[in-house]
Each structure stands twice: as C-alpha cells, then as structure tokens.
Regions:
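Conserved S-adenosyl-L-methionine
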Residues: 31-125, 137, 162-164, 207
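Flexible, glycine-/basic-rich loop-and-beta segments that form/coincide
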Residues: 196-243
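Conserved Class I SAM-dependent methyltransferase catalytic core
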Residues: 39, 79-83, 136-195, 202-208
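Short glycine/proline-rich turn/loop motifs
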Residues: 16-24
Length: 243
C-alpha cells in the first residue's frame, strides 16, 4: 500500500536516530519517536482524523504525546499494566481515558475503536483471557488478536511487534489474523533499532492491518515463509518486498 510505504519511508532514511533512541523491545515505554511519527504519518495518509484510538500497553504515553495535530479531535484511550507508568500517563494526559490494568482485564466492546496503535509487549509467554486461551497466543500475538476484535470493520491496527508474528514456522496466528484483516503493509525494522536501551538485537516489525467486514478464507502470501538466498526462512511478504 503506497500510503503506508510513504508514511514509513523515513524509517529507512533516518536509521542513525535509532542509535540514540531510548527504546525497549519488551514494552511500549520508550518507543523511538521516529517510529511513532512514521506510524502516525501512515495513518494520516489513510485519512484518520477522528474517532476512538486505543493504545494498549501505553507505558507513560509516548504515542499519546506525539499524536499529530490533524488527529486532535480523536478520543484517546490507553491501557497500562504497570501502576507507576500508568499513573504517570494519567497525570500527563488527563483528557485521555487511561486504564491501569492488564489488557486481558479490559472490557471494551467489540468494534468500538477506529484504530489501535502501539508497541505491544514481546515475549515467549501467554496471558490468561478466556476468549483467547484456546489459541495459546504468545503475548504479542494476543495483543494483535484482541485489538482486531476491538476495532470496527474498516478500522486499522498499527503495531510494533516481534518478528515472530510474521516469521514463526506455525502459521496459525497469521491465519487467525488473515481471516479477520487485510495486511496493508509491513516494515521490518533494523535489528539494532532498539539495541542501546534493551541491550538486544531482537528483530521487530511495524504491521498495519485493516479489519474486514466479514471473515475471509483467503490465504495471502504472508501466511507462509520463504527461504532467502542466504538460507534464512522469513515471511514471504518480506522475501517479496525486500525494500
């Protein structure tokens, strides 16, 4: 999708900013402002100007603080498990509706939001949510799955997530997502994008999904993996779109 690519173009051009970013691949507390602004720019290109926006795992509210003027009429919601970070976010952004609890404990109605945006928690662990327990989703995949239920048909889920969502051998979570949403675009971040703060080179992706009006049985290319010339297995989307 051209609007997504246009909005995220500077992610590639300004990689030097990542080395200075105090970011973490384990939570959304310190997402790089470069990444945040690029994601919002893509959403602006899609025409998002009003409605309800949710940031799950909002930390102290970095996405809230960088929301562009063009989206000033939106209603911003946030969820944060950590009580200290949650209280800071509530103090900084008093007009926003911020819940200090686990995402799995929230009870927002389905199709309530126009957009979900954020840096979801990464990790090889699960949370308990009766609606999703049978799928055994890892934490990052769970956040995406629940977010898709919370946005309206036509709504967008824009997240920074572990590359495991797109690259894991088992395609079950991708099939779950594909049944419910179209992949508008994806950007693989440099594997050192968050290294200075997190002391790790975990690979992460920015993914944009648009919720379908009805369930689909399509099997898009990004359900599957492909082997690169170097012998690595990566998602077919990235193999076909190396740019």
């Amino acid at each position: 999708d051209r609007s997504v690519s246009r909005g995220l173009g500077d992610v590639y051009k300004r990689q030097e900013e990542y080395s200075a970013a105090r970011a973490s691949t384990l939570n959304a507390f310190y997402t790089s402002p470069t990444v945040i602004r690029s994601m919002y720019e893509a959403l602006e290109n899609m025409g998002l100007k009003q409605g309800n926006i949710l940031e799950p795992s909002c930390g102290v509210g970095n996405f809230m603080g960088l929301i562009p003027e063009s989206m000033s009429k939106t209603n911003m919601y946030g969820v944060e498990l950590d009580p200290v970070s949650g209280r800071i976010a509530k103090q900084l952004y008093q007009k926003n509706k911020i819940a200090v609890q686990g995402f799995e404990e929230t009870s927002y109605p389905d199709s309530f939001f126009d957009c979900v945006i954020g840096n979801v928690p990464f990790g090889a662990y699960q949370v308990s949510d009766r609606r999703y327990d049978r799928h055994h989703f890892m934490i990052h995949d769970y956040f995406i799955a629940k977010s898709l239920d919370l946005v309206r048909p036509g709504g967008v889920v824009a997240v920074v997530t572990s590359s495991g969502t797109m690259d894991k051998q088992n395609p079950a979570v991708r099939q779950y997502i594909a049944n419910r949403a179209e992949l508008l675009g994806a950007i693989r971040l440099p594997n050192n994008a968050f290294q200075r703060n997190a002391n790790t080179s975990v690979v992460s992706d920015i993914l944009f999904f648009q919720k379908r009006d009805r369930a689909s049985i399509e099997e898009p290319e990004w359900l599957n993996l492909k082997e690169t010339q170097e012998g690595y297995s990566v998602n077919a989307y990235f193999a076909e779109h190396p740019e």
